[in-house]
A protein has these predicted regions:
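C-terminal auxiliary extensions adjacent to catalytic cores
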Residues: 94-165
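Generic "edge-of-domain/loop-turn" microfeature
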Residues: 7, 13, 80, 122-123, ...
Length: 189
């Protein structure tokens, strides 16, 4: 059991990774998170404390990625398996390939809450910025090309995803053109 500085109840004894349980986890985070990203972030935080710069553990928005055989899986923000109001989901699945996305959003405010992707790699920094700035699901969907992190020459699915999104929401949103300025500077308009 650790506090926000990863300190146990014993002087100068710390715990990180899945060996630690947060006494007061951040909103939307679990008290134990057994993924390597959180272990790495805890290690970076503890290194600051051990070198004289006491720092609280602040993991930010939930994210994770994994690979199931040849299928990439990524999640950013919170996407409930069974959403409860006011959370709603937009879902798109490719008819022939192992590619799908689920966008979670607040049905009242349209605030983007999170995304799960299968077969599509996403750009962490941009998605985190969209979440931190509490952008709408509409802003997120128009930024799909910039958020995509698949290697060059991979298939892209943004146009097909946007087509279904516009049909489902009765909107006429256009994709923002991929911009290295947006990608490198994390500028979301």
């Amino acid at each position: 059991l650790v506090n926000k500085y990863l300190e146990t109840n014993q002087n100068s004894i710390y715990a990180i990774g899945d060996c630690s349980e947060q006494q007061e986890p951040q909103t939307g985070r679990r008290s134990i998170e057994a993924v390597w990203y959180t272990g790495r972030m805890m290690g970076e935080t503890l290194a600051q404390t051990l070198t004289g710069n006491k720092k609280a553990y602040n993991p930010g928005h939930w994210f994770n990625s994994a690979k199931f055989f040849d299928i990439e899986y990524q999640t950013y923000g919170l996407v409930a398996a069974q959403p409860t109001k006011p959370e709603k989901h937009f879902h798109w699945k490719h008819p022939n390939e192992n590619v799908a996305i689920t966008l979670a959003y607040d049905e009242n405010t349209k605030k983007f809450l999170g995304i799960n992707t299968f077969g599509i790699r996403m750009r962490h920094e941009l998605l985190d910025k969209i979440l931190c700035e509490k952008k709408s699901v509409f802003c997120m969907i128009e930024q799909l090309a910039n958020c995509n992190f698949d290697p060059e020459f991979f298939k892209t699915y943004e146009k097909k995803i946007l087509l279904k999104f516009n049909q489902d929401f009765n909107t006429n949103i256009k994709l923002k053109k991929k911009s290295w300025k947006v990608i490198f500077n994390n500028i979301i308009s």
